[in-house]
């Protein structure tokens, strides 16, 4: 078992790369469509694709070290996009045939995120 300090280093290292990747995608792709945040969409889609690959890999090779999981999944993908983690949790429930849990999780995240985003906009406008 690795220490908490080592875990923090693995997560932080991955997170730095994920954040820089997301920022770079925004710089590269957002100017292509001024009314649409293409960099964010690509970051979310790419993060979901990558987390799917890593989940399948870790399922097949459960002996893979916790350090790699912390670096890639928690750090890099968590920083690149939180949508990938949400997608992984829903898919894990569905693969395990926990249909209701998967549906509730998907609905809760989607509706909750939309509602909290709207609430944030409302709060900002109210306090202006």
UniProtKB/Swiss-Prot annotation:
It catalyses: fluoride(in) = fluoride(out). The keyword Transport applies. Na(+) is not transported, but it plays an essential structural role and its presence is essential for fluoride channel function. Its main location: membrane. GO terms for cellular component: plasma membrane. The keyword Signal does not apply. It is a multi-pass membrane protein. It is found in: Cell inner membrane. Na(+) binds at residues 78, 81. NCBIfam families: crcB, PRK14196.1. HAMAP family: FluC (MF_00454). This is Fluoride-specific ion channel FluC. The lineage of its organism: Bacteria, Pseudomonadati, Pseudomonadota, Gammaproteobacteria, Pasteurellales. The gene is fluC.
């Amino acid at each position: 078992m690795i220490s908490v300090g080592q875990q923090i280093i693995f997560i932080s290292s991955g997170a730095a790369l994920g954040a820089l990747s997301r920022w770079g995608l925004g710089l590269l792709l957002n100017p292509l469509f001024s009314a649409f945040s293409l960099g964010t969409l690509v970051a979310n889609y790419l993060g979901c694709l990558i987390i799917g690959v890593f989940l399948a890999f870790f399922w097949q090779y459960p002996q893979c070290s916790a350090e790699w999981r912390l670096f890639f999944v928690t750090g890099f993908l968590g920083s690149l996009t939180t949508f990938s983690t949400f997608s992984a949790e829903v898919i894990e429930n569905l693969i395990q045939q926990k249909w209701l849990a998967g549906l509730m999780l998907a609905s809760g995240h989607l509706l909750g995120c939309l509602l909290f985003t709207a609430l944030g906009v409302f709060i900002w406008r109210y306090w202006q």
